[in-house]
Regions:
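C-terminal alpha-helical "lid/dimerization" subdomain adjacent to the S-adenosyl-L-methionine
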Residues: 180-227
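Conserved Class I S-adenosyl-L-methionine
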Residues: 213, 217-248, 252
């Protein structure tokens, strides 16, 4: 499939082949652990929204929704591991601006996080929040667009393959999976940011663990192929991000 210029390049980032992935399934990120709504969790989710806005996640999603969601269309979308729902709200804002109609399922397995997301989305009736495990989520129908942002590194290699398989199965038209790209730049950048700006204990712990757990460029490519992805595109983006995607011209 022909690559389209979206501001990224196909080469893996410097150092991505040197830093080994560290993943212990027994060590959960703090935000993934069972917990009630708390000031600490709200602060952590606020920091994640800021990081998404300033350091590339929103930019990546915006690039693709502008291509995939056109004026006047109606689309069903699912955002897997949605967190507090900032990406669904971003998509709804775009759809409203261009006169498109979207229905978005925002899925997460953390009930307290979903409670916060629902409160933040009170003016967004287009978004429905559902508590479910990605690997056990079996809706009656698929979706036009399937999104999964900054979530794949939460899984073991084997479960990441299963997630990518599910993304592909759920999609009628488009799939976008984006995440950090492991390497020295990611490690240094995250350590600096969490030392100087995002210093809350939960954010600092989770961000540094995420940098260690992220997949390299080559690893994500291999996981996608093991997950049955064919004719997919794969690029790196600014701020040590990478994304893989499938479009309707590709075999889903």
């Amino acid at each position: 499939m022909t690559q389209r210029p979206l501001g990224g390049s196909r080469e893996p980032p410097l150092g991505s082949r040197i830093v080994k992935r560290k993943f212990d399934p027994a060590e959960l990120e703090l935000m993934d652990r069972p917990q009630p709504v708390s000031p600490e969790l709200e602060q952590d989710l606020r920091s994640i929204r800021q990081l998404n806005r300033w350091f590339g996640s929103h930019r990546i999603v915006r690039c693709f929704v502008r291509r995939w969601i056109k004026p006047g269309v109606r689309m069903r979308i699912v955002d897997l591991a949605t967190g507090s729902g900032d990406i669904p709200r971003l998509i709804v804002d775009h759809a409203r601006q261009i006169g498109a109609r979207v229905e978005i399922v925002a899925l997460d397995q953390q009930s307290a996080t979903l409670e916060i997301g629902r409160k933040l989305s009170s003016d967004y009736p287009e978004i429905s929040f559902i508590e479910a495990d990605i690997l056990e989520f079996k809706p009656p129908d698929g979706y036009d667009i399937v999104l999964c942002s900054l979530a794949l590194h939460h899984f073991s290699d084997e479960d990441a393959v299963r997630v990518l398989w599910r993304c592909r199965e759920l999609a009628h038209k488009f799939v976008l999976v984006s995440d950090l790209c492991r390497g020295w730049l990611a490690t240094i950048g995250v350590n600096v940011l969490t030392a100087l700006i995002f210093r809350a204990p939960m954010t600092r712990f989770d961000a540094r663990l995420s940098a260690e757990r992220a997949f390299s460029f080559a690893e994500l490519d291999d996981l996608a192929r093991r997950g049955g992805w064919q004719n997919f595109c794969h690029k790196k983006f600014r701020f040590v991000r990478q994304a893989i995607w499938l479009e309707k011209t590709a075999k889903l």
